[in-house]
Amino acid sequence: MGGWSIALHGGAGDIPFSLPPERRQPREEGLRHCLQIGVEALKSQKPPLDVVELVVRELENIQHFNAGIGSVLTNSGTVEMEASIMDGKTMKCGAVSGLSTVLNPISLARLVMDKTPHIYLAFQGAQDFAKQQGVETVDSSHFITAENVERLKLAIEANRVQVDYSQYNYPQPAQDDAEKELPLANGDSQIGTVGCVAVDSHGNLASATSTGGLVNKMVGRIGDTPLIGAGTYANELCAVSATGKGEAIISATVARDVAALMEFKGLSLKEAADYVVHERTPKGTVGLIAVSAAGEIAMPFNTTGMFRASATEDGYSEIAIWPTT
């Protein structure tokens, strides 16, 4: 059995190589900060379930990601956040969606898992449960930032569900032939969704994912993030957190398929993750992070980029956005 491993993501999508430093660096610093928190927690023997909740809570508190405080707006200018969490050892899980006042959706998902006979609570029922549990809530206006209002305005003007990085607020240079081979920016990428997967030295696994969804989404739209087996999954073999176009992730049951290929086909983590991302989902739509019980890490994506970070007990660590050779 290998030692502990951890991986986290800050979303996959159409991230141009020309992304300005003022947009790139805060996300990289956020990933670095949260990775360190996760590493220290694993070193101190915290269970992976606690680790992934802790890391995703921290990611939700960083406005540069599309989760928690940074959540994007619906077509009515409101926030509807969603999250899920799963423990690989027990297969217990919890999920929430339609949240507009809960500061840290991932912790409410954990409470659904721990304190109710259910797996999934949504909208008013979830918010009532949050009040019952004494979860920290704020006025919904807390989540309405100037940047997200502007992003929604651009999306409405363009009559599209999402404005991607390449169209947001700065000039985009003409593409050369190499760039034209990359997945096209189609406005459907799910920018900034956050997730974390972890395994301890005993092979215990957990996964957590949180998001604000898609810019200009219809009120009531639910994506892959709170759906166990789509955006989040963990069992005794692996833990997976997905990001990208939610509808593509749902229809391909991305997270569960990685585990199923390992279980029923005997594929390695990397083989299973690569197959799901590159063979079973449309180009330009999906990325994921995954760890195995043996401590392996996989972080494939078929978008132009994915904000990601990882570390292992043997000292390896990585923070990256675009493909690495």
UniProtKB/Swiss-Prot annotation:
SUPFAM superfamilies according to UniProt: N-terminal nucleophile aminohydrolases (Ntn hydrolases)
UniProt-annotated catalytic positions: 193 (nucleophile)
Q: Give the Gene Ontology MF terms in alphabetical order.
A: asparaginase activity; beta-aspartyl-peptidase activity
Site residues, Cleavage: 192-193
EC number per UniProt: 3.4.19.5
Any signal peptide, and if so, which residues? none
Is the keyword Protease in the record?
Answer: yes
State the tissue distribution: Developing seeds.
Catalyses:
Cleavage of a beta-linked Asp residue from the N-terminus of a polypeptide
Q: Where does substrate bind?
A: 221-224, 243-246
What modifications does the entry list under PTM / processing? Cleaved into an alpha and beta chain by autocatalysis; this activates the enzyme. The N-terminal residue of the beta subunit is responsible for the nucleophile hydrolase activity.
- PANTHER family assigned to the protein according to its UniProt record, in alphabetical order: L-ASPARAGINASE, N(4)-(BETA-N-ACETYLGLUCOSAMINYL)-L-ASPARAGINASE
Q: What does this protein do?
A: Acts in asparagine catabolism but also in the final steps of protein degradation via hydrolysis of a range of isoaspartyl dipeptides.
**Quaternary arrangement and interactors, per the entry?**
Heterotetramer of two alpha and two beta chains arranged as a dimer of alpha/beta heterodimers.
What protein is this chain from?
Isoaspartyl peptidase/L-asparaginase
What organism, scientifically named, is this protein from? Lupinus angustifolius
Query: Taxonomically, what lineage is the organism?
Result: Eukaryota, Viridiplantae, Streptophyta, Embryophyta, Tracheophyta
